[in-house]
Amino acid sequence: MEPSVLLLLALLVGFLLLLARGHPKSRGNFPPGPRPLPLLGNLLQMDRGGLLKSLIQLREKYGDVFTVHLGPRPVVMLCGTDTIREALVGQAEAFSGRGTVAVVEPTFKEYGVIFANGERWKTLRRFSLATMRDFGMGKRSVEERIQEEAQCLVEELRKSQGAPLDPTFLFQCITANVICSIVFGERFEYTDRQFLRLLELFYQTFSLISSFSSQMFELFSGFLKYFPGAHRQISKNLQELLDYIGHSVERHKATLDPSVPRDFIDIYLLRMEKEKSNQNAEFHHQNLMMSVLSLFFVGTETSSTTLHYGFLLMLKYPHVTEKVQKEIDQVIGSHRLPTLDDRTKMPYSDAVIHEIQRFSDLIPIGVPHRVTKDTLFRGYLLPKNTEVYPILSSALHDPQYFEQPDSFNPDQFLDANGALKKSEAFLPFSTGQIFDQKSVGKRICLGESIARSELFLFFTSILQNFSVASHVAPKDIDLTPKESGIGKIPPTYQICFLAR
């Protein structure tokens, strides 16, 4: 072998040994996990079926708390309801940091309410929660907006006259319009060209973030960022969305009336003006843009995708659909709109919606957290800034809380008397949770209350007016998602809405 080749190999081996020795794992007492390779981490343990499948397999060997090296960085995985709640609720402050999502980090850069950390996050979170509540989070004003959108949807579905259609677009329209009315102060017609482009960007971006390519990027972003891939299209899409938001902000500035704020953007602009003399204020243009993008994106895709899964499940299990419609007929009838007050009188319908969220498992791997200080957890010392992934799928499919964790069965949310039964394992959107309008956990999804209202009112409004059918027999309907990464993308399907 040539001396130059031997020298190169020796230098490479020495470099890899230095990397292994200097690994941050030595700074703490991390949970057990598979032995990593220098630079590659645990790539060899990653199943082609996706990151979630790999993590579930590793849990069987290492338990509910284990370490996986995503490329060169150690990440602690939390599995099971009790483990997740012990960390993110029992030690909420320590686990309240936000970890990095590599495919969107170049856009957000720790700005905005979802990806911010420290005092910036606390300030933006307080402001956003208060503002969303002022504009009716869980109150009548948002209920009326959802009811209005539900009626627009019903009229649109009547036009189909029972012909098969793909519901993806319409479900995006209704959920996007609700969040648009709160954030931008307006709703769009379903034929509006700008609106259609925004919806296309949302769907494509969520699909790309959930792709296998993006999962690989999370492992080796430091290297792969220099090459073409899904991450570049994601950044391009997010920039186009930001361009639209920027134009909207400028229109708001030109028409702002301080005595009558119209929406989230107006209230933020007023706060910016109030604190413009404060050099350390977090109310600046960058945080406004990223907060609006976060609310806009999450407020559209999570609810619309849940509805998409929900009606596929209604086609798969027609006996469930019939029971929901029977309850709708008994409680609401056919001559008035469903209201949020109806929910407490409709435990079966509410249980079905809960089970749709649980079974569809939309965000199987929760958005990463980060410990804000050196943290002792279950005998392990996690150094400050250690990333932590809550595997929400392991809670939603937890056999300690659900008798049939891998089956669709709404009865799992009903007690012996037929009343709705709440479960601590029900964590469909985030590691926060709402019980009787009280949040549990620090990183609760800001729009969760709105999403709950949307799902109930849209779901019952549709089944009040339509029966659903498919040309595919229920037993042949495939529930396998198209993509399953950070999020799940349901399969496309055709559905007939038949007027009742």
Swiss-Prot record:
Keywords: Endoplasmic reticulum, Heme, Iron, Membrane, Metal-binding, Microsome, Monooxygenase, Oxidoreductase, Phosphoprotein. It is a peripheral membrane protein. Gene3D superfamilies: Cytochrome P450. One of its GO terms (cellular component) is endoplasmic reticulum membrane. InterPro entries: Cyt_P450, Cyt_P450_E_grp-I, Cyt_P450_E_grp-I_CYP2B-like, Cyt_P450_sf, Cytochrome_P450_fam2. It catalyses: an organic molecule + reduced [NADPH--hemoprotein reductase] + O2 = an alcohol + oxidized [NADPH--hemoprotein reductase] + H2O + H(+). Cytochromes P450 are a group of heme-thiolate monooxygenases. In liver microsomes, this enzyme is involved in an NADPH-dependent electron transport pathway. It oxidizes a variety of structurally unrelated compounds, including steroids, fatty acids, and xenobiotics. This is Cytochrome P450 2B10.
